[in-house]
UniProtKB/Swiss-Prot annotation:
Gene Ontology terms: cellular component: host cell cytoplasm; host cell nucleus
Protein encoded by which gene: E6
InterPro entries: E6 (IPR001334), E6_sf (IPR038575)
Protein name (record): Protein E6
Family designation: Belongs to the papillomaviridae E6 protein family.
Length: 157
């Protein structure tokens, strides 16, 4: 066992750039169906089920490569990570369209993730938050809002 560990190659930044960043791309690279692609969560070690694998890609999250081992993030750990980051790295809150003043960018050009589940907000979700005057939070130098799924989960419509 120790001999095998000694010969493991370390990933360079160039290597990482060439590796798949989504589960769908990984499945295509391996030539297997997406449903057969089982990947452990980086945080809890549980293997993502098919629905979680689809959600991971839908949220536009990126695979984590450690040497040549791949990891993702399960649904529960996405929520836990979002909460941890919010509690530890919160910077500021703005309401609705004030995000454009705070960032200096148009709402169309601002990348925003859900503060609850880490999903990448689409333009309709961003405009909905602006129109309703909902808060946007700056956390770890990135903007967070609320996605349509979490908004309905918390009955905030």
């Amino acid at each position: 066992m120790a001999e095998g560990a000694e010969h493991q190659q370390k990933l360079t930044e160039k290597d990482k750039a060439e590796l798949p960043s989504t589960i769908r791309d990984l499945a295509e690279t391996l030539g297997i169906p997406l449903i057969d692609c089982i990947i452990p969560c980086n945080f809890c070690g549980k293997f993502l089920n098919y629905l979680e694998a689809c959600e991971f890609d839908y949220k536009k999250l990126s695979l984590i490569w450690k040497d040549y081992c791949v990891f993702a993030c399960c649904r529960v750990c996405c929520g836990a990570t979002a909460t941890y980051e919010f509690n530890q790295f919160y910077e500021q809150t703005v309401l609705g369209r004030d995000i454009e003043l705070a960032s200096g960018l148009s709402i169309f050009d601002i990348d925003i993730r859900c503060q609850t589940c880490l999903a990448f907000l689409d333009i309709i979700e961003k405009l909905d938050c602006c129109g309703r005057g909902l808060p946007f939070h700056k956390v770890r130098n990135a903007w967070k809002g609320i996605c349509r799924q979490c908004k309905h989960f918390y009955h905030d419509w």
